[in-house]
Amino acid sequence: MTSNFSSTVAGLPRIGAKRELKFALEGYWNGSIEGRELAQTARQLVNTASDSLSGLDSVPFAGRSYYDAMLDTAAILGVLPERFDDIADHENDGLPLWIDRYFGAARGTETLPAQAMTKWFDTNYHYLVPELSADTRFVLDASALIEDLRCQQVRGVNARPVLVGPLTFLSLARTTDGSNPLDHLPALFEVYERLIKSFDTEWVQIDEPALVTDVAPEVLEQVRAGYTTLAKRGGVFVNTYFGSGDQALNTLAGIGLGAIGVDLVTHGVTELAAWKGEELLVAGIVDGRNIWRTDLCAALASLKRLAARGPIAVSTSCSLLHVPYTLEAENIEPEVRDWLAFGSEKITEVKLLADALAGNIDAAAFDAASAAIASRRTSPRTAPITQELPGRSRGSFNTRVTLQEKSLELPALPTTTIGSFPQTPSIRSARARLRKESITLEQYEEAMREEIDLVIAKQEELGLDVLVHGEPERNDMVQYFSELLDGFLSTANGWVQSYGSRCVRPPVLFGNVSRPAPMTVKWFQYAQSLTQKHVKGMLTGPVTILAWSFVRDDQPLATTADQVALALRDEINDLIEAGAKIIQVDEPAIRELLPLRDVDKPAYLQWSVDSFRLATAGAPDDVQIHTHMCYSEFNEVISSVIALDADVTTIEAARSDMQVLAALKSSGFELGVGPGVWDIHSPRVPSAQEVDGLLEAALQSVDPRQLWVNPDCGLKTRGWPEVEASLKVLVESAKQAREKIGATI
């Protein structure tokens, strides 16, 4: 008989409080450390993570993950892409035998492209997209995870293995032959039946966030049948998150599972009518995605109502992967600091609520939480603002095109980049020295001007048509603006994993947003003074600023987005006054916030489009507005991309083999567009044949008068030799394509 637990979290971060895994991975990749050292670092991190939950009575354990949980699952199931099969097994140094194929799939090799990468549901975390086919056969090998699990058991940790569930894995996979990944669902449940029986643990957790999305009834029937079989093992805990748990309960309640986890934050505490108290309800009442302190009194009241219906355990709404480790080392003004809870503070909140539910309430802690909630609610910095908004429309696109062609005088298939150029050690050093006050602001700005000199000169030498200043002064495309806008704060150590070794430090949007002074104008003016070619003004759009920040949850996102948009509108006006003829307002994250259920999508798409247009509609018709988008599965949002009414949209496309082109063609997209022809996420220089092929594919779907030639994304993370070589290929391909089409603008 499985014994219930009372307190846990859905999952834990893996990168390390000081980004230890990041640095170990990068050291291994560049050859400065051996595999044994990487393996040891990963083991130390999972031990530390388990120890952080010593006050809870059940500990989630996903093993040593070296890049991504979906990629881990593909490795365990033996379905890493076949093109990496020729990579030999790794030597026995503590890393899994398949680790080199695993890293090949994640990062690509000199000759093989990486797997596609996209956002995990509506979060800012990325996963590697599994590649399957109708002929895929699963070959189970969980030996590495089982070994890691035994190490935790030897340490006395009450660990439960955590797996990505069959429905979620297949729902997020793609096939290379057009078949439906979900056709493999019955077979994959059979594999999972063997997998979970191999764990010598009381509980096993299977994550199925796909169950909060729209799932076809016939698929839900298969899921119910599959989990009915898995439940016979005993101690099977199916966890859901990122949305209401009602559909999961309707599907899974009463089939013999030990526990079902539900998110009680994203859509609040819903009715959960299907739960009759037969299973342990793991109540995700502490927000795992955002950094605001929990209203402990309100949460406890909700938990008590649920506990009257059956057994419950207190948990987080999702894995703590999405929030920073701790507030402990942060120097944040006391008023706002009291409003916040990072990972370790959320673990404490779970413990406080579980104890209180058991009758052991910590009155002082509850009083402190109530005081913080009241302070945030009554602060002048969060008070509602009432104002009349300016218009959100420009002239017709045909009118704008005519004026812009005369103003810009660009060739056919104009070449450009997305914005950032390599953040070199000298740039990072200058920023660090400024932070430590070992150089003056004037010295720092002179160093940045020298970098801009280099970037402009390199672009002119390469023959690019529209230039950028390279953004050397920006540590991050959102954080840079957050540090210059009122209503935001930055953390010192608030790192979260974005993908693999890449970490980001999201700003905190805690109050009303405004722009006290111009933010980018002086850098644009300096860059434009160095060249006769057009230099783009570079801004980050309102939706992306929200998506990549921890955003206040005490007012509608639409209201906050409009506040950011008004600040950007002022900045655009100042850039135009300074001479900018092309201004790029990046919205790479516009799809990330798209709700997971169809019923919720129209409202989001309306306010996200409205906020972009509020930011850009003040630009005269002869000024060309660009936008850029990443990781966007355009079929779902193409009508909204058109509604943004940007003159040119650049899109990440190379890594997904130009799949975006079908959406563009079927939609009748008539605006300017630049589908990326160089995948900058893989550390390799594309061949001329590769870029020529992508550009030729683009020309078959897009009118040459609309088409721009550009990389997938910014070049911040790449090195100069690779950038120069790749851009040389890109520019030459564009020149040859111009000759073939024989067109000029």
UniProtKB/Swiss-Prot annotation:
5-methyltetrahydropteroyltri-L-glutamate binds at residues 19-22, 119, 502-503, 548, 592. L-homocysteine binds at residues 418-420, 471, 586. It holds the Pfam family Meth_synt_1. CDD domains: CIMS_C_terminal_like, CIMS_N_terminal_like. Its cofactor is Zn(2+). It comes from the Bacteria. The active site is at residue 681. Binds 1 zinc ion per subunit. It catalyses: 5-methyltetrahydropteroyltri-L-glutamate + L-homocysteine = tetrahydropteroyltri-L-glutamate + L-methionine. Pathway: Amino-acid biosynthesis; L-methionine biosynthesis via de novo pathway; L-methionine from L-homocysteine (MetE route): step 1/1. Its EC number is 2.1.1.14. InterPro entries: Cbl-indep_Met_Synth_N (IPR013215), Cobalamin-indep_Met_synthase (IPR006276), Met_Synth_C/arc (IPR002629), UROD/MetE-like_sf (IPR038071). GO terms for molecular function: 5-methyltetrahydropteroyltriglutamate-homocysteine S-methyltransferase activity; zinc ion binding. Zn(2+) binds at residues 628, 630, 652, 713. Catalyzes the transfer of a methyl group from 5-methyltetrahydrofolate to homocysteine resulting in methionine formation. HAMAP family: Meth_synth. This is 5-methyltetrahydropteroyltriglutamate--homocysteine methyltransferase. It comes from Corynebacterium glutamicum (strain R).
